[in-house]
């Protein structure tokens, strides 16, 4: 039995993306994020749209349909979370050599960087109050 859709979760900073990837026989690449077209949801920002579509471009896949549900964080973090989820879901459908391409280019690795917590006695995570000598 061959799968035609898969559901995967991706995370980045405080963003969580749950995507459903469909690989139909025909049709163009369509990405819906929270019910809107990706271009509109990402506020017409081509850079973040390119981040979301980069796994498909790397593997030269033109027939796909993605439904993404994202919450938390900003647009950049959400785009990276969607990219990770798409890459994870593609790794189920593709051959080992293509999976290796994704791994080498860092698409299957979660970026664990997040905001550092604020410490007491400081204004921010590392910003100290101004030192007064006298």
Swiss-Prot record:
GO CC entries: chloroplast; small ribosomal subunit
Signal peptide feature range: none
Localization annotation: Plastid, Chloroplast
The entry's keywords: Chloroplast, Plastid, Ribonucleoprotein, Ribosomal protein
GO molecular function, one term: structural constituent of ribosome
GO terms under biological process: translation
Main location: plastid
Keyword Transmembrane helix attributed: no
KW Plastid (keyword) present: yes
Family label: Belongs to the universal ribosomal protein uS9 family.
The name this protein goes by in its record: Small ribosomal subunit protein uS9c
Lineage, highest ranks first: Eukaryota, Discoba, Euglenozoa, Euglenida, Spirocuta
